Structure formats: structure tokens, C-alpha cells
């Protein structure tokens, strides 16, 4: 088995809320020394063909992926599906259903942005920043607020207006854990808990989440992640060992101007953990 030296299995393109095309991401990953890469756009597989072609041209090993939105106990929890078959009908239908709920949410968010800031044309402004009109999300509104001079950065836009509990946040009921994991497994992929350190759960709630996740067929957890500090990595190393999960590593890169770290700029997995690539070797597309 080939063990990658610098895998990055979580990032976003303009097909969801990133700012670069899949080909630009593949080139950036190669330049950063990433040797196993996955594009994991939110609730879509639209960019995967472009990503595969670009990864091959850049000489980078490639895994298919998508980041699915779910709701668990009224909190949005993201599940990354790695190694999925992009042609699977059940996965495509499930993602279509999730995306269909995004436009009404975006229109309500636009109404709140206009009410709170006095800036008109918020929906159209966010849409200009969205590479996929079916996937208008909070980062697109953040970029609109920066464009209009209301905020100096996307992070300020989230802190003032768009984060959970802020005046322009619109809660949403996404897919269930069972649905998302089912779609991923039906498509031949592995369900991986994305950036668990970001969720506002107590230790007991965290245990219940992973008990349900593994019972439903979840097999991986992001241990090394741009959102995780040293303590988070310690906690989720323990979770991986306790529940027998494979460990993943991802930058969650969105944009050269907005992301805190570049593709691949992460510490290695802690010793003793099994990387998700060990279970997905047969789904990895190696460069020729």
C-alpha cells in the first residue's frame, strides 16, 4: 500500500463556496506538495470530473468527494463522503434534494441582510459570487458585504451578521445523518465526520453523536483539520481510537484570500491512527 506523505482530503471550489475552479485547486495542491487530494464541495458532485482530469494532469493522486449537510439535534453537522461514485443515482438524487432547500434559505438570508444593513440587491449580489446558482451560501453573502464596504473581511461579516445566532443567520433542516451516510455508502464511499471540533457539543453529546454515526455506518473522522487546535486533535484522536474510526486530514481550503491555511499546510496524523486512504486504496486514482 502506498501511504501519502501530504494528503489533503477537504477543500472547496467555485462549484460550492470556494473561489477557485477545480483545475486551479489541483494545480495549487500540486505546487504545495499535496500527493493525495479530494475536492469536497458542499452538497454537490458537479466539479468532480473537472477535478479528476486536473489532478491527473498535475500528477496528484485523487479521491472523489462531497461534503453533505445534515441536521443532528438542531445543529448543522457536515459529513464528508470520500471515494463515492459520482454516477450513483441515489447519491445524486439525495444531493438534488438538499440543494433544492438552499434557494429559499438564501432568499430569506438576503431579506435579513437588506434589513440589517440597508444594502439592496443582496440576493443578486450573493449570486454573483456563486459559481453554482443552486448553492448560494453564507460565504457568498459575506463576499457581497465586503464588496459593498459594509465589512472589511468575510470573517467580520460572519461575526457581525452571518454566524449562528447572528441577525442574518437562517436555520435550516438538512438531511438526517441516516440519509447522508446511506447515500454515501450506497455510492461506495466512506462517511467521514467533518471538523467535529467546530460543533458546540458537550463531551456527552459528542459521545452520543459518534455512537449514532458509527451505528449508521460512519467510518471516519477528521482529526487533523484547519479548524482544530492541539486539544481538538487530542480529543478526536481519542474518538478515533475509541470508536475504531479511520482518521482524515484536510485543510478545508476555500480561497487564497479567505482561508487561514493553504492546501496541505497541516501537521501529520498522530501516531497509531489509520488513515482513511488505507481503507480507500481501491478508490484512489493514481497519476499515470
Over which residues does each language-model region extend?
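Extended substrate/RNA-proximal surfaces in nucleic-acid metabolism proteins
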Residues: 54-211, 272-274, 285-288
Amino acid at each position: 500500500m502506498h501511504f501519502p506523505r501530504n494528503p489533503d482530503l477537504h477543500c472547496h471550489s467555485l462549484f460550492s463556496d470556494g473561489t477557485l475552479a477545480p483545475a486551479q485547486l489541483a494545480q495549487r495542491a500540486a505546487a504545495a506538495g499535496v500527493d493525495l487530494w479530494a475536492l469536497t464541495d458542499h452538497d454537490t458532485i458537479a466539479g468532480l470530473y473537472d477535478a479528476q482530469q486536473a489532478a491527473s494532469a498535475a500528477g496528484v493522486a485523487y479521491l472523489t468527494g462531497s461534503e453533505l449537510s445534515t441536521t443532528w439535534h438542531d445543529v448543522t453537522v457536515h459529513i464528508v463522503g470520500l471515494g463515492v461514485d459520482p454516477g450513483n443515482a441515489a447519491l445524486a438524487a439525495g444531493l438534488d434534494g438538499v440543494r433544492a432547500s438552499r434557494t429559499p434559505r438564501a432568499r430569506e438570508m438576503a431579506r435579513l441582510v437588506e434589513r440589517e444593513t440597508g444594502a439592496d440587491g443582496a440576493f443578486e449580489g450573493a449570486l454573483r459570487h456563486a459559481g453554482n446558482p443552486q448553492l448560494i451560501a453564507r460565504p457568498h453573502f459575506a463576499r457581497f458585504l465586503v464588496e459593498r464596504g459594509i465589512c472589511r473581511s468575510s470573517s467580520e461579516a460572519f461575526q457581525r451578521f452571518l454566524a449562528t445566532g447572528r441577525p442574518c443567520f437562517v436555520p435550516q433542516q438538512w438531511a438526517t445523518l441516516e440519509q447522508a451516510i446511506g447515500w454515501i455508502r450506497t455510492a461506495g464511499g466512506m462517511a467521514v465526520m467533518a471538523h467535529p471540533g467546530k460543533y458546540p457539543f458537550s463531551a456527552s453529546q459528542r459521545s452520543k453523536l459518534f455512537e449514532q454515526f458509527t451505528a449508521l455506518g460512519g467510518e471516519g473522522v477528521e482529526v487533523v483539520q484547519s479548524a482544530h487546535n492541539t486539544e481538538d486533535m487530542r480529543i478526536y484522536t481519542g474518538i478515533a481510537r475509541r470508536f475504531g474510526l479511520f482518521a482524515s486530514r484536510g485543510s478545508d481550503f476555500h480561497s487564497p484570500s479567505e482561508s487561514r491555511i493553504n492546501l496541505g499546510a497541516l501537521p501529520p496524523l498522530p501516531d497509531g491512527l489509520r488513515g482513511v486512504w488505507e481503507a480507500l486504496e481501491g478508490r484512489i486514482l493514481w497519476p499515470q
